[in-house]
């Protein structure tokens, strides 16, 4: 009977350990081959540091870039004026936030973010579904956002919204990316098709 020498046995253990570690490191790491494919062209969301993840959003026909609300958190937004109703154009907005890895696992962070949104907007009908984005942990949410009064004559009517959140880790920092689509006419067939494509084709990838 063949016997393993101590050196061979140690080598086998080391190899197994290395394989296990590599598997743990790759778990939840996004990659291009895991992204969903859609027919709409993709637009790159500008990054502000070399550490931030690469984000890309599908832009269906009729949707256009709008920079009116861009700020530190809101990184990209598109709208479709042709689908406007009640003085509101359907929008798709991409946000990016930083969270310390000490906050917990990605799934916990996404759940906490959803709880904060629910409290802030006083939502009562939120539904969530775990998912992935290019292989990274994700959380899909659906809800109706309440009316927003911005002035005596300026009101944003209630909107049906769907959000897709996902998390990317870079060192000791989590980047939480969210794309949210919303409209006042959720039954519009064009909006339904476009919004589904935007959420399905959204990409989150390593910066390098």
Residue ranges of each PLM-predicted region?
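Extracytoplasmic
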Residues: 50-54, 87-91, 136-138
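Hydrophobic alpha-helical segments that drive targeting, anchoring, or assembly
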Residues: 70-74, 90-99, 159-161
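A short acidic-to-branched-hydrophobic micro-motif
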Residues: 79-108
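Short glycine/proline-enriched loop/turn "hinge" motifs that connect secondary-structure elements
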Residues: 83-86, 166-173
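Short, well-ordered beta-strand elements
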Residues: 92, 173-184
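Signature of long, low-cysteine stretches enriched in small and polar/charged residues
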Residues: 110-168, 196
